[in-house]
Amino acid sequence: MANRYNYYDLDPTYRNAFGQPLMRMTFDYKENEHKIGRHAAQVINDIAKSMNPTRLNEATARTRWTVVPYQSTHNTGGTIMGANPRDSALNKYLQSWDCHNLFVVGANVFPHNASYNPTGPVGALAYWTADAVKNRYLKDPGPLVPA
């Protein structure tokens, strides 16, 4: 879940080939995610046991977040879209609240993953944003949504 303790910033140590700082992610599960994970593992195990399997590898909740199992999944979040700048980084057109000429398109705009591949919604939002840039922003550069 999105919260103020999960964020991206510029790494003070690591740089790319052009000398620019790399993006750094600070993220870990909070108590609510731990509770959800424990509950989900228990429900999964109860369902599996009710099927009387000959072998069962019981599900367990993770204690710390690690990127390793997510190398081929659909990560989301980072620059969340929303109705106002207090709760989000981007408006509904994926335009930055702070810098009106910055549009950020991708799965980063979702607060969390709903457990489905976000490619379809990301594509739809890309068209939505491109249409707003072409038909509104280029004609009158500035915020597309009042803050």
Which positions does each model-derived feature cover?
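FAD-dependent oxidoreductase catalytic-site/capping-region signature
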Residues: 1-103, 108-110, 130-147
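A conserved FAD-binding loop/helix module that cradles the flavin
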Residues: 112-133
